């Protein structure tokens, strides 16, 4: 079971993937309050699915580009979970996440994002 965390933008995303399909996902717009929203949202995701941290096989987290504070919050939670449960931690570039969310084809993609 993989826990995926994306806090790179104002749209926060969490997902649990069981190796074959997405078991559950949860997303919301954060008004720069990731520090107080993220951990309770992960707990809520686990509560809805019955998944516990011990069931995880890895943690994946967005590594940017993106909101400096948002990235730090997501990375801190992901690293804490990975260290506490001896799990692999996988960093995923934000632009890869954006590209795959709009196109599932195995082709070259270019993502352009407005900065600032």
Where are the regions a protein language model picked out?
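Nucleotide and nucleotide-moiety/phosphate-recognizing core
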Residues: 3-4, 12-116
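Short, glycine/acidic-enriched loop or turn micro-motifs at the edges of active sites
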Residues: 9
């Amino acid at each position: 079971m993989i826990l995926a965390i994306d806090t790179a933008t104002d749209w926060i995303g969490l997902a649990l993937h069981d190796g074959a399909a997405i078991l559950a996902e949860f997303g919301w717009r954060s008004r720069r309050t990731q520090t107080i929203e993220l951990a309770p949202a992960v707990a809520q995701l686990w509560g809805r699915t019955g998944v516990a941290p011990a069931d995880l096989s890895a943690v994946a987290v967005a590594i940017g580009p993106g909101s400096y504070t948002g990235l730090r919050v997501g990375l801190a939670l992901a690293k804490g979970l990975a260290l506490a449960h001896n799990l692999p931690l996988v960093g995923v570039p934000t632009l890869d996440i954006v590209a795959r969310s709009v196109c599932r084809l195995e082709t070259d993609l270019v993502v352009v994002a407005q900065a600032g």
